[in-house]
Amino acid sequence: MRAYPIKTRYIKRGENFIPIVVEAIKNSGIKLEDGDFVVLSEKMVSTAEGNFIDESKFKPGVLAYLCYYWSKYLWGYVLGKLLKVKEDKIKNLRRMPKEETLKHKQTIIEIVGLRYALKPYAEGGVDLTNVPGTYACPLPKNPKKWAEELYKEIKKELGVDVVVMVADTDATYRVLNFYFTALPYAIDGIISGIGVFGFILGRLADVLKIGGFAGCTPLAIAGNEVYKKYSIGELTRIAFICDRVHKTIKNINEVLEKYNTYVITEEILEKLEHTPVVVVKIKEEYKPESQR
């Protein structure tokens, strides 16, 4: 299996990405073949839907304070260690800024619910990276529709029968023979909608050696039905590999420092490199740069 990130320009809020993605694939020099996977970032799809929420408009209530202290102190100093959360995540929880976190937690409570806000980080698929200003970006409202539309356009323009997947970077966990995610929804075969309980189950499975991290989470899939022969574990692994090759903002503070600003703007986002699409060739063997 080998993954190829596809560069596009920054997709703006409400902009139809389908012709942009098709053109980017044409210009990439990669020859698509029947059965290849074209994997889309959920952020690009949600941005195209205009699905932004301004967190500055939310006034924190009692539950937001509860979620803040629960995340920063109980997870940062107790549960994080017990459930073997990565050390960098624990450090970030302990440094969690109060004002911004309270607004973010209140947003999560009102948009997707308390059971997602209780997750210490990456709550409910609501993302703060690669979005301008004080906006947050929830999961796409209809990822299946976009996957189907892109599939049809690729088949029409390029004459190939591919699989189109929309995937989120948030984890899917395996517990024995079952798959869980803390996200509000996922493809069939992954138990979703359980919020923080999915996260706790996944961490416990890792500690007890009965499962653990399986990969990233496919939200929708369409096109060539060859995908039906793949297990949930294989599909989450494909999504994970795509996440590894995406070029995206990993550290907002580094970007703010580089551009000497306190807020990310669309103008800054347009200057950054974006690879919200990844082509995965299942049958092609990965080779290190030195062997190519």
Swiss-Prot record:
A Gene Ontology term for the protein's cellular component: membrane
Transmembrane segment boundaries: 175-197
Any one GO molecular-function label of the UniProt entry: coenzyme F420-0:L-glutamate ligase activity
Lipid bilayer topology: Single-pass membrane protein
Subcellular location: Membrane
Major site of localization recorded for this protein: membrane
Pfam families referenced in this protein's UniProt entry, alphabetically: F420_ligase
Keywords: Membrane, Transmembrane, Transmembrane helix
InterPro entries xref list: F420-0_gamma-glut_ligase-dom, UCP006563
Protein name according to UniProt: Uncharacterized protein MJ1361
Annotated organism of origin: Methanocaldococcus jannaschii (strain ATCC 43067 / DSM 2661 / JAL-1 / JCM 10045 / NBRC 100440) (Methanococcus jannaschii)
Taxonomy of the source species: Archaea, Methanobacteriati, Methanobacteriota, Methanomada group, Methanococci
